[in-house]
């Protein structure tokens, strides 16, 4: 069973790294770690966007889990168990034009958050008529040279998701209000989007 924890204020503490210098867990503990990560991975796919980033960090240590990673896995599981009775009241926003569905995408990223490889992490959340239907926390494949570039990469991934969802909705005869709004908080990334030819 899980040791008793105070209810964590957040699901994760910070970045994890798989290091050759740190001792690895016993084979039994390694199996427990992978099973625990598998359980929380299932949750983020279906109902717990709040733990997405913490679980993404846990997956980095699947090949060699360390005591620090195991402790973080227990923290995430404690957070899930101790917040299982909490929830969000979902109340869809009725569009002014009931024939059109409203989509809003929120996109964000850190910059070079992983000190080992300097790669950034993209985060996104897609709301359909005010209800969160798609979310993701994912490490970027390339190294961004600035915070604006990291945001720009995150936006490009978010827009791919928007295009996919719009295509799915329109394939079942649901019309989407256009243009779809993408919320971003870095002016440099907004400039790059509006002037894509100058940033290529």
Cite the ranges covered by each PLM segment.
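Long, low-complexity, charge-biased intrinsically disordered regions
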Residues: 1-200
